[in-house]
Amino acid sequence: MDEQVVKLAKETVARYRELTEELSDPAIFNDQRRYAEVAREHSRMRRGAELSERFLEALREEREARELIPAAESAEEREFFAGEAREAGRRAGELAEEIRSELIDRDPNDDKDVILEIRAGTGGDEAALFAGDLYEMYARYADRLGFRHRVLDASPAEVGGYKEIIVEIEGDGAYSVFKHEGGTHRVQRVPKTESQGRIHTSTATVAVLPEAEEVEVEINPNDLEIDVYRSSGPGGQSVNTTDSAVRITHKPTGLVVTCQNEKSQLQNKEQALRILRSRLLEREMRERQEREGQMRLAQFGSGDRSAKIRTYNFPQGRITDHRVGLTVHNLEAVLGGELEEFTKALAAKERADRLAASATGSPG
């Protein structure tokens, strides 16, 4: 049996018991931040701990059955104990694979909600229209999965679509579903204004951020520079007579977040802080992955925005994902939210990459 899995199972059970004991101590309610941290970790570890306990029990049963074989008084008895050992070993092997999938191969951010930042790239008006198409595609896919979604901020383009739109998607495992959408999406189609029928190529970029909770990313108010101004619509015209739009600059990193989608300044500030926390969490993830030598997995998993990941060819009605070499010829259905074929293929590639990294001893 894989000693790595045995060691991990024992550590998982021990840690889960520690967390259970801590949650049962009334004193923890005096520190709400600590309570939230422990409760979140306890919930996240529950399935892994249950699998680990069943795995260790199966190993114990296999060992005990094998120990009884030499003392058996008949061939039938020896075969019975051998059969018991084989059955327990088979269960242990199956559980080991589940543990590997749950605890080794799994991204710790998979259970989180997600923030998608969609921006028009090269291609002018067509890029803005394509950014709008991507937003509609993700919104419809979220609806199909029963996830909630809402626009946190948007900069509409005059011709339609968006120069930028930031969307929050809430649901169990939302990040695991959308995390592979990060990167540059390319569209090839004939613009409505093109009289010669020439195909134009445009791009839009998507950044995928696991939504950070307050307990994960602490922000010092002294590190923030907050400006307020009037909201504006397409073309820059004012759509609000009060200074409700908010721009927050995080001075230590230089990150800037603007939000003008809500009607009140307070709501826009809260939304901007949520986006800022998620960007800071993503930044921390990337820095950690770089330190651990995981840039290949990092770019695949969290979305290297410079990488062209997918091409949408309207004249041929096809979509190609360049990371897994998958081409489908139902472009309209995919833009209508039927993304499952891509998300399943990308999740399978991630699992294979993580397993390969684990087998070679690389961090993963």
From Swiss-Prot:
Gene3D superfamilies: 3.30.160.20, 3.30.70.1660, 6.10.140.1950. Disulfide bonds: none annotated. Its main location: cytoplasm. It comes from the Bacteria. Methylated by PrmC. Methylation increases the termination efficiency of RF1. InterPro entries: PCRF, Pep_chain_release_fac_I, Pep_chain_release_fac_I_sf, Prokaryotic/Mito_RF, RF-1. The modification N5-methylglutamine is found at Q237. It is found in: Cytoplasm. One of its GO terms (molecular function) is translation release factor activity, codon specific. Peptide chain release factor 1 directs the termination of translation in response to the peptide chain termination codons UAG and UAA. Belongs to the prokaryotic/mitochondrial release factor family. This is Peptide chain release factor 1. It comes from Rubrobacter xylanophilus (strain DSM 9941 / JCM 11954 / NBRC 16129 / PRD-1).
